[in-house]
């Protein structure tokens, strides 16, 4: 608390080299397992296939023919 109130004491600690809280990007990736993940891709899950199937089914049921018409 004294350091917070005393500007001279704060200045003395300003240049202190203390690595607490400093983590490199490589260390962060290793911690979360990000080294082996390709961020541009997302694996398809079973819920994705369910949504795709439902979307195609609904779309097909709304269109009376497979030909391109003004109604589709």
From Swiss-Prot:
This is Lantibiotic lichenicidin VK21 A2. GO terms for cellular component: extracellular space. It is found in: Secreted. The keyword Secreted applies. GO terms for molecular function: signaling receptor binding. NCBIfam families: lant_II_LchA2, lant_SP_1948. The modification 2-oxobutanoic acid is found at residue 41. The modification 2,3-didehydroalanine (Ser) is found at residue 48. It comes from Bacillus licheniformis. There is a cross-link at residues 47-51, 59-63 (Lanthionine (Ser-Cys)). There is a cross-link at residues 65-68, 69-72 (Beta-methyllanthionine (Thr-Cys)). Residues 1-40 form a propeptide. Disulfide bonds: none annotated. Residues 1-21 are annotated as: Disordered. The modification (Z)-2,3-didehydrobutyrine is found at residues 42, 45-46, 53, 57, 66. Keywords: Antibiotic, Antimicrobial, Bacteriocin, Lantibiotic, Secreted, Thioether bond. GO terms for biological process: defense response to Gram-positive bacterium; killing of cells of another organism. It comes from the Bacteria. Lanthionine-containing peptide antibiotic (lantibiotic) active on Gram-positive bacteria. The bactericidal activity of lantibiotics is based on depolarization of energized bacterial cytoplasmic membranes, initiated by the formation of aqueous transmembrane pores. When present individually, LchA2 exhibits activity towards B.subtilis L1 (IC(50)=30 uM), Rhodococcus sp. SS2 (IC(50)=16.6 uM), M.luteus B1314 (IC(50)=2.6 uM), B.megaterium VKM41 (IC(50)=2 uM), S.aureus 209p (IC(50)=20 uM), B.pumilus 2001, B.globigii I, B.amyloliquefaciens I, M.smegmatis 1171 and M.phlei 1291. Maturation of lantibiotics involves the enzymatic conversion of Thr, and Ser into dehydrated AA and the formation of thioether bonds with cysteine. This is followed by membrane translocation and cleavage of the modified precursor. The 2,3-didehydrobutyrines are determined to be the Z-isomers.
């Amino acid at each position: 608390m004294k350091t917070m109130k005393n500007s001279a004491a704060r200045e003395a600690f300003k240049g202190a080299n203390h690595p607490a809280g400093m983590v490199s990007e490589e260390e962060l990736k290793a911690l979360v397992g990000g080294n082996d993940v390709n961020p541009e891709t997302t694996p398809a899950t079973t819920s994705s296939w369910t949504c795709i199937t439902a979307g195609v089914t609904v779309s097909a049921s709304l269109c009376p023919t497979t030909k391109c018409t003004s109604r589709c």
